[in-house]
């Protein structure tokens, strides 16, 4: 797991800037993204918080696909629980999510729509079975035009399981 974090730190160059306030903010349905988030948090000494859906997904792949497709088709994103952390206190946000439908998971859409990320540096990291980081990073840039989107890191789910 340390190799995964070191790759992220080298790619972003942000991990060495200790003056900045950092938050690891992530959504994880089955624990894979949480594993990566916790390693980043541990290595950086950053604060950490999970994004949680009010109505959790079941963890069943087919049920998640069915529900996720319906949410996307209707543009009705899942409600999320209020964050406990005050986002205004952070300069750098490591934003983690699994890849769903080629981009970030639906609860992240709700998060992006409900928070002010202006002036923040966002470092995306994702876990995926197929697909990867590029499309979700491009979508983050569109969704958060007033934030700086740094180069992020994508890791295959199978690689996280082996490293844990």
Short names for language-model regions:
Residues 1-4:
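Positively charged n-region of N-terminal signal peptides that target proteins for export
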Residues 58-66:
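Hydrolase active-site cap/lid region
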């Amino acid at each position: 797991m340390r190799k995964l974090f070191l790759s992220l730190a080298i790619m972003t160059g942000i991990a060495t800037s200790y003056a900045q306030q950092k938050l690891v903010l992530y959504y994880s349905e089955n624990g894979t993204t949480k594993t990566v988030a916790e390693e980043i948090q541990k290595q950086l000494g950053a604060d950490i918080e999970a994004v949680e859906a009010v109505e959790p997904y079941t963890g069943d792949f087919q049920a998640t696909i069915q529900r996720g497709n319906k949410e996307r088709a209707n543009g009705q994103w899942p409600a999320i629980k209020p964050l406990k952390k005050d986002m205004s206190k952070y300069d750098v946000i490591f934003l983690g999510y699994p890849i769903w439908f080629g981009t970030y998971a639906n609860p992240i859409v709700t998060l992006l729509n409900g928070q002010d990320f202006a002036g923040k540096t966002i470092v995306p990291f994702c876990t995926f079975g197929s697909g990867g980081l590029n499309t979700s990073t491009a979508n983050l840039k569109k969704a958060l035009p007033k934030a700086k989107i740094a180069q992020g890191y994508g890791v295959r789910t199978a690689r996280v399981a082996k490293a844990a």
